[in-house]
Design a protein with these regions (language model features):
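A structural motif shared across PLP-dependent enzymes of the aminotransferase-like
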Residues: 16, 36, 62, 89, ...
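Ribokinase/PfkB-type carbohydrate-kinase core domain
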Residues: 1-9, 69-83, 94-144
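Short glycine/serine/threonine-rich phosphate/pyrophosphate-binding segments
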Residues: 39-42, 88-89, 141-143
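Beta-strand->loop->alpha-helix junctions that form or flank phosphate-binding loops
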Residues: 31, 57-62, 78-89
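Short Asp/Glu-rich motifs
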Residues: 65-67, 90-91
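Glycine-rich phosphate/adenosyl-contacting loop at the front of the ribokinase-like
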Residues: 1-57, 66-69
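Thr-Gly-centered strand-to-loop micro-motif
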Residues: 30, 37, 90-91, 134-135
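Acidic surface patches and DE-rich sequence motifs
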Residues: 21-22, 61, 97
Length: 144
């Protein structure tokens, strides 16, 4: 059995803040960390760690090439990830406050540029008995 995670691949910019920025407010962050993220990426890595033969499909910009390296290091196949020119990788701006709560601003970027042709090619490499895992952060869900 193979699993295809067709979903978002994001760069997460995580800011540690005293409190969430309010309307009209400028707030200095205590720290900034950059992580790989996106529901598709996170789910693919979790499945691979659990022993599943896992592929991910989606899209990144040139700035997201490091996400493919992280997926490969986790034994996730990236054959069906497109690297797009002139489109930024999807990203999340995450505020984490001192209580552990968060607020997230999401930019779809390349996640919103998946094509029907790309979906057809990716899905064509899987068959009955294989699994398809989707989430709502890509643009071709109605087609897929």
């Amino acid at each position: 059995m193979k699993v295809l995670c067709f979903g978002s691949l994001n760069i997460d910019y995580t800011y540690r803040v005293d409190h969430f920025v309010g309307r009209g407010e400028t707030l200095a962050a205590e720290s900034l960390q950059v992580f790989s993220g996106g529901k598709g990426l996170n789910q693919a890595i979790a499945l691979a760690r659990a022993g599943a033969e896992t592929w991910v499909a989606g899209a990144v910009g040139e700035d997201g090439r490091f996400l493919l390296e992280e997926l490969a290091a986790a034994d996730v196949r990236t054959d069906h990830v497109s690297i797009l020119q002139q489109v930024r990788t999807g990203n999340a701006i995450i505020q984490n406050d001192k209580t552990g709560d968060n607020c997230i601003l999401l930019y779809g970027g390349a996640n919103r540029a998946v094509t029907e042709a790309q979906a057809d090619v990716a899905l064509g490499h899987f068959c009955a008995g294989d699994w398809l895992l989707l989430q709502n952060e890509i643009n071709q869900l109605p087609y897929i």
